[in-house]
Amino acid sequence: MSTDDVVAITQLIAAYGPAVDTGDGDAVAALFAEDGWYDVAGMRFEGRAQIAAMVHGGGHQGLIAEGVAHVMGLPHVVVSGDTATAVNQSVVFRKTHVWRVAANRWTFTRTATGWLVQSRVNRLLDGAQEARDLLRQERRA
């Protein structure tokens, strides 16, 4: 596991918030592999087109119009050859308050042009075991 790999993956995660908060669905989708997917609150978006559509959709655009900030916590990254996993917490702020606090488990694949997100699972940290398990899985990796 090289420091360069960890930095590149951390940068991908860090790029998510600014891209999604500016409504740039194409930039969000470009973080993912062509066949990458994102599962948030039980909704699964498969492929770049669906991920971009989520950001461009009315629900997300409404959040942006009211004021929103997606803040990614520092990830714990484990690289194994051309794949990697990371876990982190994220906080979504709405104008004046915390709206959601979540656990994230990301997988990554190394491509000819660099690292891309293969998958992201996001679950609310609301006391449910499923969210805690996302964070716990990485320690066993």
Segments (PLM) and residue ranges:
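Short, conserved clusters of charged catalytic residues that mark active-site
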Residues: 11, 72, 103
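Short beta-strand segments enriched in hydrophobic/aromatic residues
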Residues: 20, 32-33, 90-92, 121-124
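Short, low-complexity N-terminal intrinsically disordered segments enriched in polar/charged residues
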Residues: 1-34
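Short, cysteine-centered beta-strand-loop-beta hairpins and adjacent loop/turn segments enriched
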Residues: 92-99
